């Protein structure tokens, strides 16, 4: 299949699965707002591996995965009907560890990045060493209090 058509089909399948969950067509209470990041479809369109994450702990993650696995048949027929596919893909849902790891790498990069000149010249007020900030000076000037600078 044409790679461009395959990419369009992948994004449309993810959109259809998300729509089914958001519109309440999936009745399983274990399925609660997962984020679908990518999908790998076989060339013959019979199999699709759907990668997802969600903001949850390990116990909730297991329940969410079980819920998605249990409604995979429904989602397959829902997607097949809406996209008018010749064969409905069999979905396999996989927790996306690579997405979580990429978020951690981004956080580490942000933490190790050098401070900007502005941050060096104007430290955070929480880290203030007793210096007065502009708001305090403004409040004092309005109330008539004079400070030594």
Curated annotation (Swiss-Prot):
Task: Report the domain of life of the source organism.
Answer: Bacteria
Give the Pfam families listed for this entry.
RBFA (PF02033)
Subcellular location, record wording: Cytoplasm
Single Gene Ontology BP term?
maturation of SSU-rRNA
Compositional bias per record (Basic and acidic residues), positions renumbered to this chain: 116-125
**Per UniProt, which keywords does this protein have?**
Cytoplasm, Ribosome biogenesis
Q: Where is this region: Disordered?
A: 116-149
Q: Does the keyword rRNA-binding apply?
A: no
| Classification via InterPro entries | KH_dom-like_a/b, RbfA, RbfA_dom_sf
Any single GO molecular-function term of the entry would be: ribosomal small subunit binding
Q: Which GO terms describe its cellular component?
A: cytosol
Which segments show compositional bias classed as Acidic residues? 126-143
Indicate whether Cytoplasm appears among the record's keywords. yes
* Function summary: One of several proteins that assist in the late maturation steps of the functional core of the 30S ribosomal subunit. Associates with free 30S ribosomal subunits (but not with 30S subunits that are part of 70S ribosomes or polysomes). Required for efficient processing of 16S rRNA. May interact with the 5'-terminal helix region of 16S rRNA.
Matches recorded under HAMAP family: RbfA
Q: How does the annotation summarize its subunit structure?
A: Monomer. Binds 30S ribosomal subunits, but not 50S ribosomal subunits or 70S ribosomes.
Concerning its family, UniProt says:
Belongs to the RbfA family.
Q: What is this protein called?
A: Ribosome-binding factor A
What lineage is on file? Bacteria, Pseudomonadati, Spirochaetota, Spirochaetia, Leptospirales
């Amino acid at each position: 299949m044409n790679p461009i058509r395959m990419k369009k089909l992948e994004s449309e399948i993810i959109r259809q699965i998300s729509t089914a969950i958001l519109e309440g067509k999936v009745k399983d209470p274990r399925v609660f707002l997962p984020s679908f990041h990518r999908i790998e479809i076989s060339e013959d369109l019979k199999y699709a591996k759907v990668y997802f994450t969600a903001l949850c702990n390990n116990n909730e993650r297991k329940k969410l995965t079980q819920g998605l696995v249990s409604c995979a048949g429904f989602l397959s027929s829902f997607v097949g009907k809406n996209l008018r596919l010749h064969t409905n893909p069999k979905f396999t849902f996989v927790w996306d560890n690579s997405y979580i790891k990429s978020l951690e790498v981004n956080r580490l990069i942000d933490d190790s990045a050098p401070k900007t000149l502005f941050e060096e010249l104007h430290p955070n007020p929480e880290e203030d060493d007793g210096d007065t900030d502009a708001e305090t000076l403004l409040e004092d000037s309005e109330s008539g209090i004079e400070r030594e600078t």
